[in-house]
């Protein structure tokens, strides 16, 4: 957890009142932070305050005081002004940076901005340095992910450039040094420096070093190690140039957003920021000539439901109208949609808010954890999906089927080509998330190291066929089943753009019969445990005057599927809801050949969650 230094005089100035230490300690505790220590430097009182590691907006005095001020009810309407906020305006002011094609994936990205007319003094100077270092340590993972350089704008000859330069061509005077250092000697020069030696390993194996240079050829910084001495900021600096190089563009944008949003309170006009344009070379490996205007002050909107808020927070008497003043204390604006729904406008500097649960956490903090009425907790209640899974498992085991557990990852070729299938488009909004969807677009593994593990499975059948292939030499018939999760993408219909579903797959293989009758019998057996019967079984029992459940039932609907023999495959449809929750059939010989299987195979696969959701209505 990062700890920041807050001078009492800064606290008084920014909060607009003097708060005694005991009261401040209570406020911090309620807000979810802690006064770790109190130090004195002469007559100056300094609070050491520990803040959450994911709240990058609180790692500076400006952000912390702004948040506490709002929390105690002193609301301030902060409105940021982005000046020169277009590519044309930036080019006119020479506020742009060219990224050379030599810049590779080891430090691919750069984000920049300009702050002008900064009212600099000793406290502001120290706050800038501390904010920079806290972002380096936490967000930047000790400069591995990103490194920030803050320069005296007036000493720079714009525009600037970012490139990887040959070591022998690098010559500059580093920060707080008096002698010129060449790139060939750079590592040796700093290997005994107690503050910088731990960062040298980041670039020690680079053939070329990353540098940012101005139009006059002056090296401004050699990230992620050090800036030049010529552009260092002092108490007399009035204009700031901020640059952040990174291997993750999103994190670099977060860092620059935090710096600009916090330090712009010292600018004239207040909260004004000058935009900066970054243009990548057309041969740049990652960006291919893209251009970006920074900083990106873009809020995001989330829609929340009161049932979820009450369930997660435990505040059972909370109404939708109570939410707005609570979130206002946390500097988040909200809007009521109806009696059960509201939207929130998440500030761009709150990168920690990624899900509805983060909004609920802020509501609970504003409400006060001490004000939430405790309830007796029900311990060791079995999850309904787990209970359902266990029931299926027991039934199949009693029917002499052996359970297997296979990998959740596999190759695209196996999941689709070997099954003679093609997945649906990633932007297909017609996919019903409540149904059985083996053709849904898969979740892909980024930068997969092996072709065997490229995607997350969308069906259990593929790995079951691989398992049969590996065990075809054993005594026949083979009876296996697997209960496991599949995943597929959802195109903006869920907060993670993907969904997990619990599937059951049953496979039967024998030399003398395809086993479709056996598979059909197993389907009836497992669904009977849920009092779920087929339409023909209900009709048959009614003729015998035997009462069985008939309000919910399933029927087998013939279909065509290239993975199965024609006229030997059916959809399993849940009625009267008309939800397809599974498939049953005999695997096509071509598919069996693809998996090196030389005996007939029948399979069942069902979406357990579809059944469970309907029966629990």
UniProtKB/Swiss-Prot annotation:
- Write the Enzyme Commission number(s) for this entry: 6.1.1.20
This protein's source sits in the domain of life called Eukaryota
Q: Which UniProt keywords apply?
A: Aminoacyl-tRNA synthetase, ATP-binding, Cytoplasm, Ligase, Magnesium, Metal-binding, Nucleotide-binding, Protein biosynthesis
Q: Which residues form the B5 domain?
A: 297-374
Task: Give one GO biological process term.
Answer: protein heterotetramerization
- Give its localization: Cytoplasm, Cytosol
**Cofactors (names):** Mg(2+)
**What's one GO-annotated cellular component?**
cytosol
The terms under GO molecular function for this entry are:
ATP binding; magnesium ion binding; phenylalanine-tRNA ligase activity; RNA binding
Q: Which reaction does it catalyse?
A: tRNA(Phe) + L-phenylalanine + ATP = L-phenylalanyl-tRNA(Phe) + AMP + diphosphate + H(+)
**PROSITE patterns named among the record's database cross-references:** B5
What positions does the entry give for Mg(2+) binding?
Answer: 352, 358, 361-362
Q: What is its main location?
A: cytoplasm
The UniProt note on how this protein's activity is regulated states: Inhibited by bicyclic azetidine BRD1389, which competes for L-phenylalanine.
The annotated subunit structure for this chain is: Heterotetramer; dimer of two heterodimers formed by alpha and beta subunits.
Family the UniProt entry places it in:
Belongs to the phenylalanyl-tRNA synthetase beta subunit family. Type 2 subfamily.
Q: What is this protein called?
A: Phenylalanine--tRNA ligase beta subunit
Organism annotation: Plasmodium vivax (strain Salvador I)
């Amino acid at each position: 957890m990062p700890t920041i230094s807050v001078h009492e005089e800064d606290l008084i100035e920014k909060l607009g009142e003097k708060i005694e230490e005991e009261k401040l300690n209570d406020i911090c505790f309620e807000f979810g932070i802690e006064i770790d220590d109190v130090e004195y430097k002469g007559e100056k009182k300094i609070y050491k305050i520990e803040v959450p590691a994911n709240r990058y907006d609180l790692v500076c005095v400006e952000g912390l005081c702004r948040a506490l001020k709002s929390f105690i009810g002193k609301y301030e309407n902060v409105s940021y002004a982005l000046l020169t906020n277009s590519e044309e305006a930036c080019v006119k002011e020479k506020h742009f940076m060219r990224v050379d094609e030599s810049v590779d994936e080891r430090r691919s990205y750069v984000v920049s901005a300009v702050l002008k007319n900064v009212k600099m003094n000793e406290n502001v100077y120290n706050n800038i340095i501390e904010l920079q270092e806290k972002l380096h340590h936490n967000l930047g993972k000790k400069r591995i992910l990103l490194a920030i350089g803050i320069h005296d704008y007036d000493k720079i000859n714009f525009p600037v450039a970012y490139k990887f330069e040959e070591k022998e061509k690098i010559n500059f005077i580093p920060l707080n040094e008096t002698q010129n250092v060449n790139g060939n000697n750079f590592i040796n020069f700093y290997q005994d420096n107690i503050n910088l030696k731990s960062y040298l390993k980041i670039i020690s194996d680079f053939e070329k070093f990353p540098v940012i240079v101005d139009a006059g050829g002056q090296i401004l910084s050699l990230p992620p190690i050090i800036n030049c001495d010529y552009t260092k900021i002092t108490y007399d600096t009035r204009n700031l140039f901020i640059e952040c190089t990174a291997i993750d563009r999103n994190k670099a944008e977060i860092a620059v957003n935090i710096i600009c949003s916090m330090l712009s309170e010292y600018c004239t006009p207040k909260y004004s920021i000058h935009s900066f344009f970054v243009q990548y070379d057309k041969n740049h490996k990652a960006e291919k000539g893209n251009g970006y205007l920074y900083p990106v002050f873009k809020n995001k909107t989330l829609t929340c439901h009161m049932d979820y808020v009450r369930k997660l927070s435990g505040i059972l008497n909370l109404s939708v109208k109570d939410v707005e003043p609570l979130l206002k204390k946390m500097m988040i604006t909200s809007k009521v949609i109806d009696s059960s729904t509201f939207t929130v406008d998440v500030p761009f500097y709150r990168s920690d808010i990624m899900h509805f649960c983060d909004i609920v956490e802020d509501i609970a903090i504003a409400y006060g954890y001490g004000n939430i009425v405790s309830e007796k907790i029900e311990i060791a209640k079995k999850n309904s999906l787990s209970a359902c899974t266990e029931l299926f498992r027991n039934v199949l085991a009693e029917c002499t089927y052996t359970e297997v557990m296979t990998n959740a990852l596999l190759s695209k070729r196996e999941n689709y080509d070997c099954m003679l299938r093609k997945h649906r488009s990633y932007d297909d909004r017609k996919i019903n998330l409540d149904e059985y969807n083996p053709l849904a677009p898969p979740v892909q593994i980024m930068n997969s190291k092996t072709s065997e593990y490229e995607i997350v499975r969308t069906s259990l059948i593929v790995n079951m066929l691989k398992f049969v292939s590996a065990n075809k030499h054993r005594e026949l018939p083979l009876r296996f089943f697997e209960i496991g999760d599949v995943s597929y993408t959802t195109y903006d219909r869920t907060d993670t753009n993907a969904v997990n579903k619990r599937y059951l797959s049953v496979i039967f293989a024998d030399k003398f019969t395809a086993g479709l009758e056996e598979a059909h019998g197993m389907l009836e057996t497992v669904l009977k445990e849920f009092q779920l019967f087929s339409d023909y079984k209900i009709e048959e029992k009614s003729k015998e005057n035997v009462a069985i459940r008939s309000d919910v039932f399933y029927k087998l609907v013939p279909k065509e599927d290239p993975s199965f023999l024609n006229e030997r495959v059916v959809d399993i449809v849940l009625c009267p809801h008309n939800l397809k929750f599974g498939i049953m059939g005999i695997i096509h010989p071509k598919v069996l050949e693809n998996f090196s299987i030389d005996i007939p195979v029948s399979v069942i696969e069902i979406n357990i969650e579809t059944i469970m959701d309907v029966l629990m209505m």
